[in-house]
């Protein structure tokens, strides 16, 4: 009987121990899971609230968030510390100036930190608080209801990947505000894409990182330099293009093209560049024959630099041109004063004193005393006294007496430019070339001529062509034969001329 009782007590003890152990095992398996869920929820709540505390600076906020990540079990304590610090840093002056009572301030603060309101909703509630502070409690109640109704479901809450992506994107230094906000919004919209969004954000951040070589790549530097030297941009336009280059160096080529287009569009028109006086001076200086290229270029540059002194510059250029003009030996222009007939017997402006009519010395019409042949009063054709060759006084070709303005005495003419004339047309009409006319007249540009301008034109006529024509025009007298002309008609003409001169002297 005693043994049976001992066995029963032992059996009861084993049973109690088994039940106790089972209870402990069951309790130990459930408690950690529940605790983990609670910690996660507390961490998320603390994370949201810390992010939206307006009086924390970036370093403080990042420190609290890092603490939440390191030990989620301390979320409540971390949140408490953050709230204390946030409250202690709240601006006092603003609260006093805005005359917000305690209810209004509390509602204002809570609404600012409601994570599920969008910006329009948040701003609407805040405006209602400002409009009627006495309704602060009611406004706050409505805001809380809306915030809770828009709260993400438990399965859509921010998981660890999303939180990590959110934190990293916030601290990427090369993203601008618009880019950063875009990635954060994408994280909120679809947390399942957190890894992909973080990867994209990192790529963009790296691509926008400043380069080690002065931040500007080659294209950007080139565009920067060219835009600085575009003369027709104003300061505002130039600064705008430069700022755009800094903001996005990848668009350097496009920005430079736009700047060039604008510069060309604003370039002064040709007819506005030079005023009338400047154009006239420019043209005249180009055609001053005695200036060197260096002198001509100097005057033209001065005209460009200051069009307002065009008259003075032109006057100086003319003075220098006149001073450098070649001196004339006989102070006459050959072939002009004698109507292009060289070799008159008086060797000085032949034909001018007697109104260009040969034979005037005896007061009669030319050629009457010598068988109706003009110029017979001296027994020879003009220029015969120097061995029958007109213009031979100096043993040179006709018209060469003073070495100036070639071609005046040898059949060359002066062409006065008419409206519509071109150098090529003048050259064709006179049997010469445009280059020859340009060279004879020292034209800087053979296309730059103006109406009224006189051009020396080489007509390509042999020097003795006129004499040959005259000789052929008198075949019946035999004057084309030098011997007959000298012995017979020459003698008679000399005798008759001498008699007439003697008679005229007696009359005088």
From Swiss-Prot:
Membrane topology field: Peptidoglycan-anchor
Immunoglobulin-binding region E repeats: 37-92
PROSITE patterns: GRAM_POS_ANCHORING, LYSM
Short sequence motif YSIRK-G/S signaling motif: positions: 7-18
Modification Pentaglycyl murein peptidoglycan amidated threonine, positions: 477
Sequence repeats: 333-340, 341-348, 349-356, 357-364, 365-372, 373-380, 381-388, 389-396, 397-404, 405-412
Compartments in which it is found: Secreted, Cell wall; Secreted
Sequence ranges of the Immunoglobulin-binding region C repeats: 270-327
Gene3D superfamilies on file: Immunoglobulin FC, subunit C (1.20.5.420), LysM domain (3.10.350.10)
Domain of life, per lineage: Bacteria
Extent of the Immunoglobulin-binding region A repeats: 154-211
Amino-acid biosynthesis recorded as keyword: no
Feature: compositional bias, Basic and acidic residues: 318-412
Pfam families according to UniProt: B, Gram_pos_anchor, LysM, Octapeptide, YSIRK_signal
GO cellular component, one term: extracellular region
Family affiliation: Belongs to the immunoglobulin-binding protein SpA family.
The protein's name in its UniProt record: Immunoglobulin G-binding protein A
Source organism: Staphylococcus aureus (strain Newman)
Originating gene: spa
């Amino acid at each position: 009987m005693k043994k049976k009782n001992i066995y029963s007590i032992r059996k009861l003890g084993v049973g109690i121990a088994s039940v106790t152990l089972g209870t402990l095992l069951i309790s130990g398996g459930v408690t950690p899971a529940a605790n983990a869920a609670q910690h996660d929820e507390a961490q998320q709540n603390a994370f949201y609230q810390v992010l939206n505390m307006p009086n924390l600076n970036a370093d403080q906020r990042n420190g609290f968030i890092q603490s939440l990540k390191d030990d989620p079990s301390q979320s409540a304590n971390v949140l408490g510390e953050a709230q204390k610090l946030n409250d202690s840093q709240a601006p006092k002056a603003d609260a006093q100036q805005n005359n917000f009572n305690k209810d209004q301030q509390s509602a204002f603060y809570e609404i600012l930190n409601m994570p599920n309101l969008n910006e329009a909703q948040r701003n609407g509630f805040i405006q209602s608080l400002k409009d009627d502070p006495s309704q602060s409690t009611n406004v706050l109640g409505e805001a809380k209801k809306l915030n809770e109704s828009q709260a993400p479901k438990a399965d859509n809450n921010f998981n660890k990947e999303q939180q990590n992506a959110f934190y990293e994107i916030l601290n990427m230094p090369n993203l601008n505000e618009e880019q950063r906000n875009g990635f954060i919004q994408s994280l909120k919209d679809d947390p399942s894409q957190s890894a992909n969004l973080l990867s994209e954000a990192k790529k963009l951040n790296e691509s926008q990182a400043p380069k080690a070589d002065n931040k500007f790549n080659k294209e950007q530097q080139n565009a920067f330099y060219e835009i600085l030297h575009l003369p027709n941009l104003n300061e505002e336009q130039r600064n705008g293009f430069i700022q755009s280059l800094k903001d996005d160096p990848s668009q350097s080529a496009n920005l430079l093209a736009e700047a060039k287009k604008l510069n060309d569009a604003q370039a002064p028109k040709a007819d506005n560049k030079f005023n009338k006086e400047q154009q006239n001076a420019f043209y005249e200086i180009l055609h001053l024959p005695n200036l060197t290229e260096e002198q001509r270029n100097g005057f033209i540059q001065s005209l460009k630099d200051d069009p307002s002194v065009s008259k003075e510059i032109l006057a100086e250029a003319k003075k220098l041109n006149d001073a450098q003009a070649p001196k004339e030996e006989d102070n006459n222009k050959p072939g002009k004063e004698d109507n292009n007939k060289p070799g008159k017997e008086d060797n000085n402006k032949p034909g001018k004193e007697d109104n260009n009519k040969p034979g005037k010395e005896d007061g009669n019409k030319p050629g009457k005393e010598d068988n109706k042949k003009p110029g017979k009063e001296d027994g020879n054709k003009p220029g015969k006294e120097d061995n029958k060759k007109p213009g031979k006084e100096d043993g040179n070709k006709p018209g060469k007496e003073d070495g100036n303005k070639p071609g005046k005495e040898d059949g060359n003419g002066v062409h006065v430019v008419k409206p519509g004339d071109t150098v090529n047309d003048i050259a064709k009409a006179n049997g010469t070339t445009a280059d020859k006319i340009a060279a004879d007249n020292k034209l800087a540009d053979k296309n730059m001529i103006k109406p009224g301008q006189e051009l020396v034109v080489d007509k390509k006529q042999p020097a003795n062509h006129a004499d040959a024509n005259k000789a052929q025009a008198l075949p019946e007298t035999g004057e084309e034969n030098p011997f007959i002309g000298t012995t017979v008609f020459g003698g008679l003409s000399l005798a008759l001329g001498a008699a007439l001169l003697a008679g005229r002297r007696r009359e005088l």
